A protein has these predicted regions:
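Conserved C-terminal "lid"/linker of ANL adenylate-forming enzymes
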Residues: 24-26, 77-136
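AMP-binding/adenylate-forming catalytic core of the ANL superfamily
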Residues: 1-87, 100-104
């Protein structure tokens, strides 16, 4: 973080990815005031989950990413991840993205590893305007 705290993102990301419809979680904090996460949804797993909650399983992914029930379920897993770390290491904010990180969109390697610098670059505007906005 900007405060000099080194945080290992792997364990936090793994807990968040235990949510049945989360495909990827990318924990961010380097040179940032607090820890945050970008979360992607697995459409195949999400659709039956939505239906099981009495929600429309056919909503567009953009709408699903902003759905209150989806957000609440992801928040449960973020909270669980935060239980195992100090306050300085905990995820304070997260954004659910409407698209996954893939090789096709250039955000994953052939060995299915997320390319952090490319993700950060692609979502820089979102991070700067929604995640790390300065309060006036």
């Amino acid at each position: 973080t900007a405060g000099g705290k080194n945080v290992s993102p792997g364990p936090i990301e793994e807990v968040i990815k235990r949510c049945e419809f989360v495909s990827q979680a990318l924990v961010l904090g380097d040179k940032r005031p607090f820890i945050s996460a970008l979360v992607t949804l697995d459409e195949e797993s999400l659709r039956p989950w939505l239906e099981s909650k009495g929600l429309n399983r056919d909503i567009p992914m953009e709408e699903a990413a902003n759905n209150a029930a989806v957000r609440a379920e992801v928040q449960k897993w973020v909270d669980q991840a935060n239980e195992g770390v100090s306050r300085a290491e905990s995820v304070r904010k997260f954004i659910i993205l409407p698209e996954e990180f893939t090789q096709e969109n250039g955000l994953m390697t052939a060995s299915m590893k997320v390319i952090r610098p490319k993700v950060i670059k692609r979502y820089a505007t979102l991070l700067n305007t929604q995640m790390y906005t300065k309060k006036k």
